[in-house]
Each structure stands twice: as C-alpha cells, then as structure tokens.
Amino acid sequence: HSFPTRRSSDLFNIKNKIFKGIGILFVLILLGFFIWINKTYEPQKLAKEALVSNSKVEVTVNENISFTPKGRKVSKGLILYPGAKVEIESYAPLARKIAESGYEVVIVKMPLNLAILGTNKAQKVMDSYNNIEHWVIGGHSLGGVAASNFARDNKLIEGVVFLASYPMGDELKELGKKVISIWGSKDGVVNFKSLVESKQKLPDDTTYVEIEGGNHAQFGDYGKQKGDNDAIISQEKQLNITANSIIKFLKNIS
C-alpha cells in the first residue's frame, strides 16, 4: 500500500482550511446582510396617523397600501416604490395628500424592503384596477431607479416621478413619457453629481423641482436616515411642496 506523502497531507490541510475560511466568510457576509436588511426605517407618528381613513380618502392596508379618493370619479393612478429599507407606511403622509386631490395612490410592498427586488410589482397593481385610464409610477431614492426600469418597459405608464432619485440609463429620454424630478438641497444621501448628470438622460421637457432646505428622509416619515443632513425646513413644508408638485404633474397627464 502506498501512503499519502506528508506533502500531500499538508496540501489537503491547507485546502481544508481555505474552504473552511471561505465558508465562514460566506456565513458572516450572509449574517451581515440579514442584520443590515432587518434594520429598517420605521414609520413615525405622522405616517401612522395618515393610515386612517377619513371623509376624503379611504385607506386600504393589504400587502400594499392604497389611498382611494371618496365620492369622486378617479381615472388617474400613481404607484409609489419605497426607498431602500424604508417600510412603506412611512410614505402614507405624501400618498394621502395626493389622494385628497382625486388621484388613486398605491404604495407597493417590496421583498426585503428593496424595490430593486420587485421592479415589476406595479404590473399586479395595474391589473387590479379597471377604472384607472392613466398610470404614473414614482419612487424615492432606490425606489425611483426600480420605478424607472418598470416605466421603461411598460407602454401603459405615462409618467415617472423621481424623489431624490434618477434613472440608471437614458432609455426614458426618447419614450415620450412625462417626467418630474424632485430633490432637497440639503440631501446628504443622494449622489448630486449623478443627479445633475442624469438630466442628460431625461426628456427635454422634464420638470425639475429643488426643494430649498429639504433633505432625503423628509419625503417620508421614518426619522433620521444614516448619512443624511438635517433639513432646514419643516417636514410638513417639504411634504406639501412635494405633494403639490406631483399633483400639478398628474393634472397634466392626459
């Protein structure tokens, strides 16, 4: 019988250690990802209050959250994708303000709270409404990227709303869709260089709204976001400017 030489046995041990090391590293990366993904931004007081139906708006909380104007014919709808790791209830104040002006608004629940993992979720929303003749999609931060990817591939989407966001490619430029891009001047999260450069990727008639003193987190109501700057305007003011800009944009969709 031939016995393994010491050299081959050493080699086996080294390989074994390397594989074990890779295995441990993989587990640690996975663990880190799950810890990161489970630390979400949660809705605060204003958001929770906005989830209650009133005389103007019916709020329905299922997998998604829909805001339906009461007592009026609704023919335009806005689908909203959340920012990364932001729980969708956080966008209730904005959605409600828009719905009060007569538009259906649906905030879409995403896998692991990452819109990029559920880019096509808007399709199911659109399929579930018979009364909506005009659809617009929008998103906050990473949600805007996912929303623009969906809009790029869907002929029935007539407009795109970017909140502290921008598209990855220039596909929207020539598609004939309306676009509005809104951001806060004190945003500490968005990459301003990419935001400015994205103007080249958007249609020539895009509407741009810079909210003086607004930041990244005040498009929702989920507290302070890591890396963000303090806003120098109130949350209410930022929400009002955002909602009014979107309402004006929706009016012009036809």
Residue spans for each PLM region:
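Short alpha-helix in the alpha/beta-hydrolase fold that links the catalytic acid
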Residues: L94, V190-Q200
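Hydrophobic membrane-insertion alpha-helices, especially the h-region
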Residues: F19-W36
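Short beta-strand/loop motif that positions the catalytic acidic residue
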Residues: L175, S181-W183, D187
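Short, small-residue-biased leader/transition segments that mark boundaries at the very start
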Residues: H1-S8
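Short beta-strand element of the alpha/beta-hydrolase
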Residues: S75-G83
